[in-house]
Structures are given as structure tokens and as C-alpha cells.
């Protein structure tokens, strides 16, 4: 398919009036499995390897004692919402986004735990799945299950921001993430800032670990220009999307579907994409999650899953009592693989941003920007599906589809996050892909 077949000119954005962003800090009880007290003596480096890097933790303690004692624990929950989205952040558990939902259809576009059930996965041991985990300067970073600093800010444009951050004690890097919700927009924005205040060059890694609910009808959507996927360290490559879901089986499956990973857990990184989005879609719920960021700064696109197998069921029980399977749609800054560290110079400041938003009703995603997600795909016969889900109100927007030099669809529509566009268009001769 080439640029001769164009769809979608969304024009004339019209802001809604009188819509506010709400921000508050509240105390909420969440069922929590307690962890035991850490080792009181310092633990120095013993040659341990963690996530492909040196696994030293000093001066942090090791939280490796789990218990089966569950209590109703009070948490400080930081909440942001507007008419479209509602999110919750837990500064006492690493500043992660704990929950996010689309208010127009109640779809949780991040995996939302109904409780806190840690497992021994993090750098310091205890670790929580779900939501969005900020991994700086290492994967499943040291303070992922620890309290970190936070503050709230109201901005002149009407948006509101919850900032979380810390000075990391091993590298002495300072980092902060500002999570914002805007009036009249369905996106959640994260602004990331990493500073090296030390006189020495330091290594750093950034990956946002985004979890989503998944099932037999869930599909990972890499950009359509992706033809290859890589495993960790880039030591193994696979064709995309058709390849061995279960390594060593000798059988090819569609790697984009969670249901096909019946053998074991798996990570696959998108290789060589020139596009700036990543998505996932639940066809049973006809809804999904989209991420957009500058691909030159945030090139990493990856998914991880425990799998549709006994191993996956085991990890479900380890990490959650009631919330089911999840899949991680990770995105990496300054990195397209793990572990893939970059160097940050003395005094260097790195800043970038990324957004996520829910989509619905369009049966998949073929491209996405900050303004909208589009689906354009063949259905039956000569028909193509044309779908748009916008992140704000567009009045009298124009949808245009061209076949060669001829317009075959020209529509004026009103569209917003609560009102998607989905129609069929007939293409005169779809048999030759070079004409599309």
C-alpha cells in the first residue's frame, strides 16, 4: 500500500468550553499483602547480575521477604481526571500510574489492580505489576516499590500535572516524571526529565513499563512498517508478524496475538520502525490503548507477556488475586532494546514527552498521532474499513479517501473521544497492492 490511497484530513479543531481538569490527593484503602522488614546490614556487590547489568543495590536495602498477610492499607492516591479519562497515581509505590480508565466506556486502558500483591521481580525484590512503572536509570528500578517525592501543579493552559521523582542513590541521577491531563483532551501526557548532577559520566536506561489487560482477543499493534522483531540483547531476530511464537516449535503463528504464545513467556522489540506510535487492541471490548512519542527520542517499542499457558497462569496467581492476564506494552527513550544503556554526561539534562490515550470502536489501529488514531484495512470484497478515534473535538472535519488520483470518499463529520467514525468504502480494484 502506498501514498496513492490517502485517508483522513481532520481539520478545524474546535475546543470545548467550560470543561475542567480535576486534581486531588485522597486517602484510599487498598487490599495489600505485607512485605517483611529488610535486611538491616548493608549488602555490597557480590557479582549478582540483574536485567543484564551489574546488580549492586547498596545503599538500598533488600526487600525480599514476602508474606501471606493481607491488610486493608491506607494509601495516598493522587487523582487526575477530566470528562474523558481518570487516572490514579501511587507515590508510595514508586510513583507509578496505578489505574487509568476511559470514562466514555469504562475501559481500563492501563491494567488496573484491585489490590497490591508484590512478587520478587524488582531490583530490590518486592515489585508490583500493572499500571505504568517508570524505569530510570535501570529496568524495574531500585525504588519501584518505595515511596518517592511528589508535588502537584496547575498550569496556565488549564492542564494539571502530578510530578513524581527522586535522586537515585546509586548513580546520584535526578529524575522526575510529570503526568498531565488537559482540558478537552483524552490523552495522558508524561514529561520526563533526567539530570546528571555528578562530575562523572553515568549510564542510564529509560523504559516506561505499561501494562494492559489481555485475553484471547487481544492484539499487539506494532507500526505497519515493522518487518522484524528482536529479542533481548538483539541476539535473536524473527520475522514480524508471522514467526515462531513458541521458540523451537518449528511452527509459525501470528506473533501479534497474545493467544498464540502457548509455550512460555516472551519479549519482542519492534525493529527499524520509522513511525512514532505503538498500540494494543481488545477486539472483544472493541477498545484499546495508543502510545505516541517522537521516534527519534523514544524509539523503543516492545511487548512482554507471561503467555497463554501454565506459566502465565502461575504468574497471574503470584501477582494478583483477581485481575487476570496482563501484557506489557513498553516504550523506551534513548533505547530500542533491553538492556541497552546510554551515557549521560556530567551536567547533562535530558527532557522528552510521550502520550497515551484510549481508543474504541475502530476495530484496530494503523497509524496514530497526538490528534487521532486511524484504522484503514481491507474487509470483504472490494471494501475497506475507514475508522477514526480523536483525542479532542473536531467539528466539520473532512475525511478524504483517494484511489490513485480519484476521490472515492469525501465526508464532513463531527468527531470527539466519545464519538468515533467508522465506515466502509469500496475500492475499484484492490487486487493489485501497488495501486493502493
Residue ranges of predicted features:
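Surface beta-strand/loop "capping" patches
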Residues: 361-394
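Short, aromatic- and glycine-rich surface loops/edge beta-strands on solvent-exposed regions
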Residues: 399-400, 431-436
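Extended, loop-rich substrate-binding clefts of extracytoplasmic carbohydrate-active enzymes
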Residues: 44-72, 77-81, 128-186, 216, ...
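Beta-strand-rich binding/interaction modules
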Residues: 383-412
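Mature N-terminal, pre-catalytic/accessory segment of carbohydrate-active enzymes
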Residues: 19-67, 71-81, 85, 93-95, ...
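Asparagine-centered strand-capping/turn motif at beta-strand->loop junctions
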Residues: 193-200, 388-390
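Aromatic sugar-binding surface patches on proteins
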Residues: 415-430
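A contiguous, surface-exposed recognition patch within enzymatic or periplasmic domains that forms
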Residues: 26-38, 42-43, 78-80, 85-99, ...
